[in-house]
């Protein structure tokens, strides 16, 4: 592994976790979005992540949730069908919040790896100056 591979790998992790956080923010914003039963439900987005040979990760795309979503009874909703149902996204807030915590922790860990690597590089430069 080269001298700056740690930074390259941590940078790819930061980018992946930022993409994950962005998709979760959108999913959470739409967790209560309902549509008519004849329409497509909001599709949650989940990054598709692949490892990079030599270290790191890359986001290759987004997996979309089920367009059918789930049917919920809400007879007072103006979008409800004759039977009182609307279509909602397949995921709930609890699932999204759990993933949000994981994405935040991953982002924080990648930041810490970057800081530690920079400190190590600075220390090595100081040794070289002596």
Language-model segments: residues:
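Amphipathic alpha-helical polymerization modules
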Residues: 1-130
């Amino acid at each position: 592994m080269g001298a700056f591979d740690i930074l390259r790998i941590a940078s790819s992790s930061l980018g992946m976790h930022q993409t994950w956080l962005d998709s979760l923010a959108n999913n959470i914003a739409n967790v209560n979005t309902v549509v008519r039963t004849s329409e497509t439900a909001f599709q949650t987005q989940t990054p598709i992540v692949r490892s990079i040979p030599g270290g790191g990760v890359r986001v290759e795309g987004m997996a979309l949730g089920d367009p059918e979503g789930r049917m919920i009874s809400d007879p007072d909703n103006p979008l409800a069908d004759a039977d009182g149902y609307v279509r909602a996204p397949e995921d709930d807030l609890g699932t999204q919040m759990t993933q949000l915590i994981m994405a935040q922790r991953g982002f924080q860990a990648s930041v810490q790896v970057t800081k530690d690597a920079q400190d190590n590089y600075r220390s090595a430069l100081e040794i070289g100056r002596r």
